[in-house]
Regions:
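Conserved short alpha-helical segments that host acidic/polar catalytic motifs at enzyme active sites
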Residues: 1-210
Length: 210
């Protein structure tokens, strides 16, 4: 109840997207090629998933982290900052852009999640959803991801972000999340616990590639 928790993981089906690690970058992280000689197309897989702007922690699955950082730095809201972006251009999947922002201030915590997705695979229409959670309950979290399962094309996430249990200390929670991920496809995991009283944080990074 005294800490705000963020977890972000990446999965990979192709050699190109499996060839990645998370590295710390200032107060945030970025993705980097594990073996630079095998990097084919960096455009959608090399980015900063986590950046910190004052008392706000931004977490996304693409370079929209920078769009949100720059927008909020100019006093735009999270939702306004994302209006200039849409789903990724990777036909036929049109991977949704998912984003989150955590706001810790004066002993209070709230967060919001966003998904920008095609209209059931129709790239002429972008569907935009923002979910805001004020004063979230201790021990609970919300989980949003890109796809709801396998298929061709891959079907985008639908509905509200899933209610999940958040328990244990940072090492226990990190182990639980990492061990729950598909062993073949998991690539990297980032976990951060932020003390709501003073904003201090602890971070864990797990990389399959070592």
């Amino acid at each position: 109840g005294s800490e705000a928790v963020a977890a972000y993981f990446i999965m990979g089906r192709s050699e190109n997207s499996r060839n990645r690690i998370f590295v710390e970058d200032g107060e945030g992280i970025r993705t980097q090629a594990f073996d630079p000689s095998k990097m084919k197309d960096p455009s959608l897989i090399i980015y900063a998933p986590v950046r910190v702007l004052g008392n706000k922690t931004i977490v996304t699955n693409g370079d929209q982290t920078d769009t949100i950082f720059e927008g909020m730095d100019k006093q735009m809201t999270f939702e306004q900052s994302l209006r200039s972006r849409e789903f990724e251009p990777d036909a036929p999947n049109f991977t949704p852009r998912i984003s989150g922002v955590m706001h810790v201030e004066n002993g209070t915590y709230n967060f919001a999640l966003s998904i920008l997705k095609s209209d059931n695979g129709d790239s002429s229409s972008c569907n935009r959803f923002t979910f805001a959670y004020e004063n979230p309950k201790a021990g609970t979290g919300r989980f949003i991801h890109t796809y709801i399962g396998d298929g061709n094309p891959l079907p985008s996430f639908e509905g509200e972000p899933t209610l999940v249990e958040v328990k244990g200390n940072i090492d226990e929670f990190t182990d639980e999340v990492w061990n729950s991920l598909n062993n073949d496809n998991k690539v990297s995991l980032f976990v951060r616990f932020i003390d709501v009283k003073n904003g201090k944080y602890e971070t864990r990074i797990v990389n399959k590639n070592k």
